[in-house]
Amino acid sequence: MSNVFYISIFHIAGIKDGIGKKYVRGFYSERRMGMKLIFVRHGEGEHTKDSPSSLQVPHPPLTDEGRNQAKLIQCNVPLQEKDILIASPTIRTLQTATIWSAKVACQKIVHPYVSPRIFPYREGATTLPCDHIVDQGRIKKLFSNFSIEKSTNKQLWTEGINTISENSFQRIVEEFLLWCYELGAERICIVSHDGTITAYRQYLQKVVLTRADFLQETGIYEMDVSFKSLIGEI
Protein backbone atom coordinates (compact mmCIF):
# COMPACT_ATOMS: atom_id res chain seq x y z
CA MET A 1 0.00 0.00 0.00
CA SER A 2 1.30 3.44 -0.86
CA ASN A 3 1.30 6.51 1.35
CA VAL A 4 0.98 10.08 0.15
CA PHE A 5 2.60 12.93 2.04
CA TYR A 6 2.47 16.54 0.90
CA ILE A 7 5.50 18.70 1.54
CA SER A 8 6.54 22.17 0.50
CA ILE A 9 10.21 22.66 -0.18
CA PHE A 10 11.26 25.94 1.43
CA HIS A 11 14.52 24.62 2.84
CA ILE A 12 16.21 23.72 -0.45
CA ALA A 13 19.99 24.08 -0.52
CA GLY A 14 21.14 27.66 -0.92
CA ILE A 15 17.76 29.30 -0.32
CA LYS A 16 17.86 29.56 3.43
CA ASP A 17 21.19 31.36 3.42
CA GLY A 18 20.41 33.65 0.50
CA ILE A 19 22.25 31.80 -2.25
CA GLY A 20 20.37 30.89 -5.38
CA LYS A 21 17.16 32.86 -4.75
CA LYS A 22 17.20 34.43 -8.18
CA TYR A 23 17.68 30.99 -9.71
CA VAL A 24 14.71 29.57 -7.82
CA ARG A 25 12.38 32.43 -8.81
CA GLY A 26 13.16 31.84 -12.47
CA PHE A 27 13.06 28.11 -12.00
CA TYR A 28 9.65 28.29 -10.35
CA SER A 29 8.16 30.45 -13.09
CA GLU A 30 9.32 28.10 -15.84
CA ARG A 31 8.44 24.76 -14.23
CA ARG A 32 5.29 23.03 -13.05
CA MET A 33 4.05 23.57 -9.53
CA GLY A 34 5.21 20.27 -8.10
CA MET A 35 6.16 16.66 -8.66
CA LYS A 36 5.38 13.27 -7.24
CA LEU A 37 8.13 11.12 -5.77
CA ILE A 38 7.38 7.39 -5.69
CA PHE A 39 9.84 5.48 -3.52
CA VAL A 40 9.97 1.70 -3.96
CA ARG A 41 12.06 -0.67 -1.91
CA HIS A 42 13.87 -3.32 -3.95
CA GLY A 43 12.70 -6.94 -4.01
CA GLU A 44 14.09 -9.67 -1.79
CA GLY A 45 17.86 -9.94 -2.13
CA GLU A 46 20.20 -12.88 -1.57
CA HIS A 47 21.81 -11.00 1.33
CA THR A 48 18.68 -11.52 3.46
CA LYS A 49 18.51 -15.31 3.14
CA ASP A 50 21.12 -16.32 5.72
CA SER A 51 21.71 -13.26 7.87
CA PRO A 52 24.11 -12.20 9.29
CA SER A 53 26.64 -14.20 7.27
CA SER A 54 24.93 -13.39 3.96
CA LEU A 55 25.43 -9.68 4.65
CA GLN A 56 29.13 -10.22 3.96
CA VAL A 57 28.48 -11.15 0.31
CA PRO A 58 29.16 -8.22 -2.05
CA HIS A 59 26.65 -7.14 -4.70
CA PRO A 60 23.87 -9.63 -3.87
CA PRO A 61 21.26 -10.10 -6.64
CA LEU A 62 17.52 -10.63 -6.26
CA THR A 63 16.23 -14.03 -5.26
CA ASP A 64 13.58 -15.75 -7.37
CA GLU A 65 11.04 -14.40 -4.90
CA GLY A 66 12.52 -10.92 -5.32
CA ARG A 67 12.08 -11.12 -9.09
CA ASN A 68 8.46 -12.16 -8.66
CA GLN A 69 7.92 -9.27 -6.26
CA ALA A 70 9.39 -6.86 -8.80
CA LYS A 71 6.99 -8.11 -11.48
CA LEU A 72 4.05 -7.23 -9.25
CA ILE A 73 5.11 -3.57 -9.20
CA GLN A 74 4.19 -3.43 -12.89
CA CYS A 75 0.56 -3.83 -11.80
CA ASN A 76 0.70 -1.91 -8.52
CA VAL A 77 2.41 1.16 -9.99
CA PRO A 78 2.34 1.02 -13.80
CA LEU A 79 5.08 3.15 -15.32
CA GLN A 80 4.46 5.60 -18.15
CA GLU A 81 6.91 6.73 -20.80
CA LYS A 82 6.93 10.26 -19.39
CA ASP A 83 8.01 8.99 -15.95
CA ILE A 84 11.66 9.03 -14.92
CA LEU A 85 12.96 5.97 -13.12
CA ILE A 86 15.94 6.38 -10.78
CA ALA A 87 17.77 3.43 -9.23
CA SER A 88 20.38 3.05 -6.54
CA PRO A 89 23.70 1.68 -7.91
CA THR A 90 23.34 -1.83 -6.48
CA ILE A 91 22.54 -5.04 -8.34
CA ARG A 92 19.29 -5.69 -6.47
CA THR A 93 17.88 -2.20 -7.06
CA LEU A 94 18.91 -2.16 -10.72
CA GLN A 95 17.35 -5.59 -11.23
CA THR A 96 14.14 -4.43 -9.55
CA ALA A 97 14.02 -1.30 -11.71
CA THR A 98 14.74 -3.31 -14.86
CA ILE A 99 11.89 -5.74 -14.20
CA TRP A 100 9.50 -2.94 -13.20
CA SER A 101 10.21 -1.00 -16.41
CA ALA A 102 10.39 -3.99 -18.77
CA LYS A 103 7.28 -2.97 -20.71
CA VAL A 104 7.84 0.80 -20.74
CA ALA A 105 10.45 2.87 -22.56
CA CYS A 106 10.87 5.50 -19.86
CA GLN A 107 14.11 7.30 -19.02
CA LYS A 108 16.21 5.34 -16.52
CA ILE A 109 19.03 6.83 -14.44
CA VAL A 110 21.41 5.45 -11.81
CA HIS A 111 22.14 7.86 -8.95
CA PRO A 112 24.31 7.40 -5.82
CA TYR A 113 22.18 9.86 -3.81
CA VAL A 114 19.66 7.03 -3.25
CA SER A 115 22.25 4.33 -2.52
CA PRO A 116 22.18 2.35 0.78
CA ARG A 117 21.92 4.40 3.97
CA ILE A 118 22.29 3.12 7.54
CA PHE A 119 19.20 3.98 9.56
CA PRO A 120 19.17 5.23 12.16
CA TYR A 121 22.50 6.95 11.61
CA ARG A 122 25.30 5.66 13.84
CA GLU A 123 28.57 7.53 14.08
CA GLY A 124 31.50 5.24 13.39
CA ALA A 125 29.43 2.62 11.57
CA THR A 126 30.94 0.83 8.59
CA THR A 127 29.44 -0.29 5.30
CA LEU A 128 28.71 -3.99 4.96
CA PRO A 129 29.85 -5.73 1.76
CA CYS A 130 26.23 -6.25 0.67
CA ASP A 131 25.77 -2.48 0.54
CA HIS A 132 28.83 -1.65 -1.55
CA ILE A 133 28.10 0.34 -4.69
CA VAL A 134 28.56 -1.24 -8.11
CA ASP A 135 31.19 0.58 -10.17
CA GLN A 136 30.09 2.53 -13.22
CA GLY A 137 31.85 0.26 -15.70
CA ARG A 138 29.98 -2.79 -14.48
CA ILE A 139 26.68 -0.88 -14.50
CA LYS A 140 27.23 0.12 -18.13
CA LYS A 141 27.95 -3.50 -19.03
CA LEU A 142 25.10 -5.16 -17.14
CA PHE A 143 22.45 -2.44 -17.32
CA SER A 144 23.09 -0.62 -20.57
CA ASN A 145 19.57 0.86 -20.68
CA PHE A 146 20.39 3.03 -17.68
CA SER A 147 22.24 6.31 -17.93
CA ILE A 148 24.63 7.30 -15.16
CA GLU A 149 24.33 10.61 -13.35
CA LYS A 150 27.81 12.09 -13.74
CA SER A 151 27.46 15.53 -12.20
CA THR A 152 27.32 14.26 -8.64
CA ASN A 153 30.07 14.08 -6.04
CA LYS A 154 32.60 11.56 -7.39
CA GLN A 155 33.42 10.36 -3.90
CA LEU A 156 29.84 9.18 -3.46
CA TRP A 157 30.30 6.84 -6.43
CA THR A 158 32.83 4.91 -4.36
CA GLU A 159 31.74 5.41 -0.76
CA GLY A 160 28.02 6.13 -1.14
CA ILE A 161 25.84 7.84 1.47
CA ASN A 162 25.72 4.90 3.89
CA THR A 163 27.79 6.41 6.69
CA ILE A 164 28.00 10.13 5.91
CA SER A 165 26.98 12.49 8.72
CA GLU A 166 23.39 13.64 9.18
CA ASN A 167 24.28 17.18 8.08
CA SER A 168 25.95 15.87 4.94
CA PHE A 169 22.98 13.63 4.23
CA GLN A 170 20.55 16.53 4.56
CA ARG A 171 22.52 18.48 1.97
CA ILE A 172 22.39 15.43 -0.30
CA VAL A 173 18.59 15.29 0.02
CA GLU A 174 18.28 18.97 -0.86
CA GLU A 175 20.59 18.65 -3.86
CA PHE A 176 18.75 15.54 -5.02
CA LEU A 177 15.36 17.27 -4.89
CA LEU A 178 16.60 20.20 -6.95
CA TRP A 179 18.13 17.78 -9.43
CA CYS A 180 14.80 15.95 -9.68
CA TYR A 181 12.99 19.22 -10.37
CA GLU A 182 15.43 19.98 -13.17
CA LEU A 183 14.39 16.75 -14.89
CA GLY A 184 11.00 18.32 -15.56
CA ALA A 185 8.93 15.16 -14.99
CA GLU A 186 5.70 15.03 -13.03
CA ARG A 187 6.55 11.61 -11.56
CA ILE A 188 9.96 10.53 -10.34
CA CYS A 189 10.06 6.83 -9.45
CA ILE A 190 12.94 5.79 -7.18
CA VAL A 191 14.09 2.24 -6.45
CA SER A 192 16.11 2.35 -3.25
CA HIS A 193 16.62 0.72 0.15
CA ASP A 194 14.71 0.51 3.43
CA GLY A 195 17.14 2.70 5.36
CA THR A 196 17.54 5.25 2.59
CA ILE A 197 13.82 5.67 2.00
CA THR A 198 13.16 6.03 5.73
CA ALA A 199 15.97 8.58 6.08
CA TYR A 200 14.51 10.65 3.22
CA ARG A 201 11.05 10.45 4.76
CA GLN A 202 12.30 11.47 8.19
CA TYR A 203 14.12 14.53 6.90
CA LEU A 204 11.41 15.70 4.51
CA GLN A 205 8.50 15.12 6.89
CA LYS A 206 10.36 16.46 9.94
CA VAL A 207 9.27 13.52 12.08
CA VAL A 208 11.12 10.85 14.04
CA LEU A 209 10.96 7.43 12.40
CA THR A 210 12.37 4.06 13.44
CA ARG A 211 13.24 0.78 11.79
CA ALA A 212 9.62 -0.22 12.43
CA ASP A 213 8.75 2.25 9.66
CA PHE A 214 10.80 0.39 7.05
CA LEU A 215 8.93 -0.59 3.91
CA GLN A 216 8.54 -4.27 3.17
CA GLU A 217 10.18 -5.68 0.04
CA THR A 218 8.84 -3.76 -3.01
CA GLY A 219 6.85 -1.58 -0.62
CA ILE A 220 5.78 1.81 -1.98
CA TYR A 221 5.77 5.31 -0.46
CA GLU A 222 4.56 8.37 -2.37
CA MET A 223 5.22 12.04 -1.71
CA ASP A 224 3.72 15.02 -3.51
CA VAL A 225 6.33 17.76 -3.43
CA SER A 226 5.18 21.33 -4.00
CA PHE A 227 7.00 24.58 -4.67
CA LYS A 228 3.95 26.70 -3.79
CA SER A 229 5.15 28.11 -0.48
CA LEU A 230 8.69 28.69 -1.70
CA ILE A 231 7.98 32.05 -3.35
CA GLY A 232 6.72 33.44 -0.07
CA GLU A 233 9.99 32.52 1.60
CA ILE A 234 12.36 34.22 -0.86
Where are these regions (language model features)?
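Conserved histidine-centered catalytic loops in small-molecule metabolism enzymes
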Residues: 80-113, 140-151, 224-234
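Phosphate-handling substructures
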Residues: 47, 56-61, 104-171
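Glycine-rich phosphate-binding loop signature in dinucleotide/nucleotide-binding domains
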Residues: 79-81, 182-185
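Domain-level recognition of soluble alpha/beta enzyme cores
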Residues: 205-231
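Short, Lys/Arg-enriched N-terminal segments with co-localized hydrophobic residues
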Residues: 21-34
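Active-site-proximal alpha-helix that buttresses catalytic centers in soluble enzyme cores
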Residues: 36, 40-109
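Generic beta-sheet signal
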Residues: 37, 83, 186-194
